[in-house]
């Protein structure tokens, strides 16, 4: 209430930024955009002030039959289909890798389903995020034009919202060996189709500081200080083929203290990979009954879930999904999926392990998942574990030194 009495407060205009412009960076001239190719896009000039959190990948291409004619109406690109075409995404600072995302389609889907809100859907369509089967990303000729914000693909771009100064930044994309997971064909005996990437460019904001801010920034970096960058990176692990049992123990990895998990997201897909008749952007519940995450001897959640999905008993699973946004983003939750759509499209198990006791605050941390289902896991079931953990990077703007803290 004191604010309404502050009539003496002066009017202040924020003129700290003199100019803000978007620049497009292309891959090296010799780069091709075929399956298994590696695409490198580099910001060569280091005497810049850039804002990677607002950068985006601009991707153009065509989705046609093998003879370049239009595909049938029953053949569509799936949600984040272009993500399925990128096997690996890497972000480098001064030649040092600071962030990596493998199996970009699955990683961005698992993170997106728990992070996005319904009011973002219209904007997300421009990035290739479509959840309705009747929404097409291509025109009649099969052309598509997408602008994918980097914060959908990288924890670095999502969390680090400040500018970078005197840094050579580079992204490396490895294109998948097949594009079959990027589309779904609903008709029997469907035609041969192909996805052709025609152009990839990186749209990056350049920020020009006002004279006052520029002098302050230059005075600060003159002593070559170690500037800390803290963000949460997304690490995907895959169990390609679950055994035909109703209970399974998965020793995922052993992590360092700094990079121990803060959140773990578990998802299953049954016979969806490399099958054009199945939507590779959806997940299956596999009649999941219980899930436990163990960090050394500490378990999350504390009690059993005791789900019975066949009897419509999965309220706890949906609650774990809706609670993610309030703890991860410190805001009121606005879940993307309704309870029914959650079960149909993305029944993910979201485990919050961000609050940890003294028992796991020293030494290495063993990460183990134990899960069971009401029935045996179906044949050709793949389990995905997305681990979200902290990462700290330090860089010196004058000496161009970059190091990851572990």
Locate predicted features.
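Short, low-complexity Pro/Thr/Gly
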Residues: 1-406
């Amino acid at each position: 209430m004191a604010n309404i009495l502050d009539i003496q407060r002066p009017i202040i205009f924020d003129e700290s930024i003199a100019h803000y412009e978007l620049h497009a960076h292309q891959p090296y001239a010799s780069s091709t955009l075929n399956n298994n190719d590696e695409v490198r896009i580099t910001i060569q000039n280091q005497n810049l002030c850039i804002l990677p959190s607002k950068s985006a990948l601009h991707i153009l291409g065509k989705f046609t039959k093998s003879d370049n004619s239009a595909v049938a109406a029953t053949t569509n690109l799936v949600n984040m289909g272009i993500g399925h075409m990128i096997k690996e995404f890497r972000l480098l600072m001064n030649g040092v890798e600071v962030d990596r995302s493998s199996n970009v389609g699955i990683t961005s889907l698992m993170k997106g389903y728990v992070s996005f809100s319904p009011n973002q859907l219209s904007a997300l369509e421009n990035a290739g995020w479509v959840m309705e089967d009747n929404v097409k990303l291509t025109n009649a000729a099969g052309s598509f034009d997408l602008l994918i914000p980097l914060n959908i693909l990288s924890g670095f771009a999502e969390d680090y919202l400040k500018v970078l100064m005197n840094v050579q930044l580079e992204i490396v994309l490895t294109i998948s060996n097949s594009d079959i997971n990027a589309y779904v064909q609903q008709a029997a005996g469907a035609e041969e189709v192909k996805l052709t990437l025609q152009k990839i460019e990186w749209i990056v904001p350049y920020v020009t500081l006002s004279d006052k801010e520029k002098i302050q920034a230059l005075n600060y970096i003159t002593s070559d200080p170690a500037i800390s960058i803290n963000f949460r990176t997304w690490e995907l692990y895959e169990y390609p083929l679950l055994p035909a049992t109703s209970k399974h123990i998965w020793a995922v990895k052993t992590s360092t203290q700094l990079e121990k998990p803060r959140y773990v997201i578990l998802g299953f897909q049954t016979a969806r990979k490399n099958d054009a008749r199945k939507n590779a952007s959806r997940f299956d519940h596999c009649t999941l009954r219980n899930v436990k995450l163990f960090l050394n001897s500490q378990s999350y959640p504390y009690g059993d879930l005791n789900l019975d999905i066949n009897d419509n008993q999965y309220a706890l699973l949906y609650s774990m999904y809706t609670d993610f946004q309030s703890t991860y983003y410190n805001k009121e939750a606005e879940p993307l999926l309704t309870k029914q759509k959650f079960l149909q499209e993305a029944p993910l198990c979201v485990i919050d392990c961000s609050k940890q006791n003294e028992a796991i605050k020293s030494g290495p941390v063993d990460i183990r998942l134990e899960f069971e289902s009401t029935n045996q896991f179906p044949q050709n079931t793949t389990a995905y574990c997305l681990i979200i953990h902290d990462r700290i990077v330090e860089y010196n703007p004058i000496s161009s030194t970059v190091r990851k803290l572990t």
